[in-house]
Amino acid sequence: MVAGTRCLLVLLLPQVLLGGAAGLIPELGRKKFAGASRPLSRPSEDVLSEFELRLLSMFGLKQRPTPSKDVVVPPYMLDLYRRHSGQPGALAPDHRLERAASRANTVLSFHHEEAIEELSEMSGKTSRRFFFNLSSVPTDEFLTSAELQIFREQMQEALGNSSFQHRINIYEIIKPATASSKFPVTRLLDTRLVTQNTSQWESFDVTPAVMRWTAQGHTNHGFVVEVAHLEEKPGVSKRHVRISRSLHQDEHSWSQVRPLLVTFGHDGKGHPLHKREKRQAKHKQRKRLKSSCKRHPLYVDFSDVGWNDWIVAPPGYHAFYCHGECPFPLADHLNSTNHAIVQTLVNSVNSKIPKACCVPTELSAISMLYLDENEKVVLKNYQDMVVEGCGCR
């Protein structure tokens, strides 16, 4: 059975058995269930638990996530989801971001631990140490890239003035500071000269460091983010390059601009993230019997199975399903294989041989944004979730 079809059956069956399938079963199916001569039996809790575990396993989860209500989804991840699901409202295309996502099917985001240490604020520079706990990065996942996102805010004084510049340097800490050595031993990873005439996120490549920490077993001592103030007073730059939380800043506003580490990886399953586009019909619809094999509407609503508290987006999706007869002789529009044609021919003279079946012949992926068991925000591409075409096989 095709993986995507099996996934949908697992999702639909408990809903059908429980009689709560209003949002998951097409109208025709609901009428059939409503008119059944005997009531449906209620499955045991063990059966329902097994169904849920199988579906969670397909998502790569060991248990159902139960995130707290205080978890904030970074705006960067929401925009990344919009980009790759083809939704309006996404920011302008970012070629560097597109390149990173083109080799990955999983994106993870991490906030730094708040107990950061201000290393120095002298000689026109402000430095801070950032530590990101990467223990939840899957060991069996191939890391394709990693980026540190730093937000910089617009300065009114910088409008029309290119002299308001800062240099942001990102270092990997090779050896932390000790009692005998005041400063850590570091390695430069990336650097950027920025102006403060606009508000935007700056992306820095930290792939080598994250690769050493996650794949090569090196100790993660964190990063040093250094802001060099060019022709500026340090205090002004410190407020506008957001590497620390303001004294009276509330949790929500800080969550919108706090630094973010993003990893791009591939688990070896399916294709990389891509922008989903609406497919055009390959040929005009021909006259066909109402009962012939074709695609039918089916909308899967995650709130119907109580998963809308950890699946951020989409709220549901159009999965579709295949249903209908494969009559003899098989017409061209039924998208049949030679084997199906032969099987149908034999069935016409020998009823012991079953007819060809109406099944999905083409499936596509969807992107999902969700919170995992560790309350980490994940963007992942799942294969074989949408039926694009049906045929007799």
Curated annotation (Swiss-Prot):
GO-annotated molecular function: BMP receptor binding; co-receptor binding; cytokine activity; growth factor activity; identical protein binding; phosphatase activator activity; protein domain specific binding; protein serine/threonine kinase activator activity
User: Residue ranges of region Disordered?
Assistant: 268-290
One cellular component term from this protein's GO annotations in UniProt: BMP receptor complex
Keyword presence, Metal-binding? no
Q: Which InterPro entries match?
A: BMP2_TGF_beta-like, Cystine-knot_cytokine, TGF-b_C, TGF-b_propeptide, TGF-beta-rel, TGFb_CS
Keywords associated with the record: Chondrogenesis, Cleavage on pair of basic residues, Cytokine, Developmental protein, Differentiation, Disulfide bond, Glycoprotein, Growth factor, Osteogenesis, Phosphoprotein, Secreted, Signal
Q: Which cysteines are joined by disulfide bonds?
A: 293-358, 322-390, 326-392
Compartment(s) where it occurs, according to its Swiss-Prot or TrEMBL record: Secreted
- Glycosites: 133, 161, 197, 335
Segments of skewed composition (Basic residues):
271-290
Q: Which residues form the signal peptide?
A: 1-19
Q: One of this protein's GO BP terms? A: epithelial to mesenchymal transition
Instruction: List modified residues, type Phosphoserine.
Output: 85
Which stretches of the sequence are propeptide?
Answer: 20-279
Tissue expression: Expressed in femur, calvaria, trachea, lung and ovary.
Q: How does it assemble?
A: Homodimer; disulfide-linked. Interacts with SOSTDC1. Interacts with GREM2, RGMA, RGMB and RGMC. Interacts with ASPN. Interacts with MAFP5. Interacts with FBN1 (via N-terminal domain) and FBN2. Interacts with type I receptor BMPR1A. Interacts with type II receptor BMPR2. Interacts with SCUBE3. Interacts with TNFAIP6 (primarily via Link domain); this interaction is inhibited by hyaluronan. Interacts with ERFE. Interacts with BMPR1A/ALK3; the interaction may induce HAMP expression.
Q: What does this protein do?
A: Growth factor of the TGF-beta superfamily that plays essential roles in many developmental processes, including cardiogenesis, neurogenesis, and osteogenesis. Induces cartilage and bone formation. Initiates the canonical BMP signaling cascade by associating with type I receptor BMPR1A and type II receptor BMPR2. Once all three components are bound together in a complex at the cell surface, BMPR2 phosphorylates and activates BMPR1A. In turn, BMPR1A propagates signal by phosphorylating SMAD1/5/8 that travel to the nucleus and act as activators and repressors of transcription of target genes.
Q: Which family does it belong to?
A: Belongs to the TGF-beta family.
Name the UniProt record assigns to this protein: Bone morphogenetic protein 2
